[in-house]
Amino acid sequence: MTVLIKYPFKYNNESIVSGILSENQVLAFPTETVYGLGGNAFSKEVADRIYLIKQRPKNKPFPLLITLKWLKKLCLWNDSRIDDLIEAFWPGPLTLILNSNPDLPKHLTNNSRTLAVRFSSSAVVQRLIELGDFPLIGTSANRSGFPVCSSAEEVSNQFKDDVDIIIEGYNRTENLASTIVNCLTEPFNILRQGAISLKEINHICKIQE
């Protein structure tokens, strides 16, 4: 049965959340954009469950939600434009596609040697990463072909008891999904225009639409 917990966490609820994270279970949680579905990014068990829940093909690796602590452990880059984008828009609704550290578990990249990463401004997400001491899988909370959930109620209706915990009580600040920038092309390429506009990004570095 799915557990519903409100944020900010009370002490006993925080213990429940910590336990669920450590047991490699699946959570639905609010971000500054839409609701996310995730759990321990290093756990193949969690990834496999989320692929099954979302009915998503396994050749599409999940984006990760991180904090700056995890960025250099997960990704490799040597380009000041990436640093400029990070300084300008993180934490916030910008996802960057970067080269991955070759030592990462294979399920994170599906042999693509790349990662999509975002440092969310959501206090909920940042607290979950802190409690688990690992980055989170951070895919949108919807089954393939279904609308993306933007509330705890929508998550409950769409997923029933397929997720272990739903966190509610945090108001999103953006009405769009995150903007995705591929930093592996020249010039960088915008794969999805979302909460951060092409114009805003072009103020920092040249982007191909």
Each predicted region: which residue ranges?
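Active-site-adjacent structural elements in enzyme catalytic cores
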Residues: 1-209
